[in-house]
Design a protein with these regions (language model features):
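Glycine/serine-rich anion-binding loops at beta->alpha junctions
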Residues: 107-123, 202
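Acidic/histidine-rich catalytic neighborhood of metal-dependent amide-processing enzymes
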Residues: 117-191
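Metal-dependent amide/peptide-bond hydrolase catalytic core
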Residues: 2-5, 12, 29, 54, ...
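Acidic/His- and Gly-rich active-site-bordering loop/insert found
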Residues: 2-112, 133-138, 349, 359
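Acidic-glycine-rich active-site phosphate/pyrophosphate-binding loop
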Residues: 89-105, 168-169, 184-195, 321
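Phosphate-handling active-site elements
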Residues: 105-107, 127-143, 223-233, 373, ...
Length: 391
């Protein structure tokens, strides 16, 4: 494997990574408040005043940011995408270091969002700064998109899609943590809420009631059996269906009249969410016919498709070649969680990869942390990819 040792790329240092990443982590952008507008301003302060950018406001405190490096043509180009929000910190007392102090110990920076995914944001900023310093006009435009609300409903990337600024790009790099590999696929998410209305009775006379808790459990069990026995993806494995919330019951001696279950179904490419919904409706339909008086409602809470980019696409071939040059593994990786790709790729239908610093297994964890060398390595990946294919 060729190691990166070209002096042209030596200007990106771990010290630069540390300085930028500390500034990002020290801004609290935890859900549900977000406060990404403040972080967008901090990012702009790191860059020259004459850059081309658009700030898309979602509320008084929440915003997304698009920075554009104009190309020789307006058609095509590439977009780097990273989100600015993070999940909540949880119990602060469980952290070894305050989650927004961005403490560095050796090569490791600790803090909420360090891996997911302000490390990726820092790598994007370093690549952007390098791009601006070259003072060269790329063949096609290059976009750096910093989004809000990825950890919830995705209002940031949806706002960017609605704005249309990046909708003509040829390819997208999602800068989420990919564990020193290149991701070419991600699971979809299909969340269902199933509510059963039965009939209340004394628990000593279950024959006079309709036990909503028991029937919601039976419905979910039948659905899981159908969903989890489908096709196997070579990287992502199988579709999974997990009951993540179950509510019902009044007292021990009362047959429960209502019950509610929420399912988090993670699908692999090729599995139709419409088909899963149809299966759910069919099971519910059988229950309605067999149990006189039972009522069942099904609500779709989240619907994001599974995505995959062909290994034969130019983007995958080129990014793998570039990864090898900077010491990143060319092993295929799949992501079990969804990213901003789930809300932009279906709209513009272009190839994408997931390639960013850090270990995705540390996302959302207590004592979340990232290697500064990993941030530097991915900054150089973006830099070298742009130098090779866009300058």
């Amino acid at each position: 494997m060729k190691k990166e040792n070209d002096n042209k790329y030596a200007q990106i240092t771990t010290e630069q990574c540390k300085q930028i990443l500390q500034k990002l982590v020290q801004i609290n952008t935890c859900q549900p408040e977000g406060n990404e507008g403040k972080l967008a301003d901090v990012i702009l302060e790191m860059l020259p005043e004459n850059i081309v950018y658009k700030k898309i406001n979602h509320s008084k405190t929440r915003a997304s940011l698009i920075i554009k490096v104009n190309g020789e043509t307006e058609e095509g180009g590439i977009a780097f995408v990273g989100h600015m929000d993070t999940v909540a910190c949880g119990d602060y007392s469980q952290w070894s270091y305050p989650p927004h102090d961005a403490i560095v110990k050796g090569d490791i920076l600790y803090g909420r969002g360090s891996a997911d995914m302000k490390g990726g944001d820092a790598a994007m900023i370093l690549a952007l700064k390098w791009m601006l310093e070259t003072k060269k006009r790329p063949k096609k435009s290059i976009y750096f998109c910093f989004t809000a609300d990825e950890e919830s409903k995705g209002s940031g990337i949806c706002g960017i899609v609605k704005d249309g600024t990046v909708n003509k790009v040829d390819e997208i790099i999602i800068c989420e943590p990919s564990d020193e590999k290149i991701g070419t696929c991600e699971k979809g998410a299909f969340w269902l809420k199933i509510t059963v209305q039965g009939k209340q009775s004394h628990a000593s006379r279950p024959d006079l009631g309709i036990n909503a808790v028991e029937y919601v459990e039976k419905l979910v069990a039948q659905l899981k059996e159908q969903v989890e026995t489908g096709e196997v993806h070579p990287i992502l494995g199988t579709t999974t269906a997990s009951v993540t919330k179950l509510c019902g019951g009044i007292m021990t001696n009362i047959i429960p009249p209502t019950a509610e279950a929420e399912l988090d179904i993670r699908t692999v490419p090729g599995v139709s969410h419409e088909h899963i919904l149809k299966c759910t409706e069919e099971i519910a339909g059988r229950f309605r016919k067999e149990i006189l008086g039972i009522q069942i409602t099904i609500e779709v809470m989240n619907d994001r498709p599974a995505l995959e980019t062909s290994k034969d696409s130019p983007l995958v071939k080129q990014i793998m070649k570039t990864a090898q040059m900077v010491g990143i593994s060319t092993e295929d990786k799949g992501h079990y969680f969804y990213t901003d790709a789930s809300q932009i790729i279906p709209e513009i239908s272009v190839p994408f990869v997931i390639a960013g610093p850090g270990d995705d297994a540390l996302a959302h964890c207590i004592n979340e942390h990232i290697s500064l060398e990993s941030v530097r390595r991915y900054a150089k990946l973006y830099q070298k990819y742009l130098e090779k294919y866009y300058l």
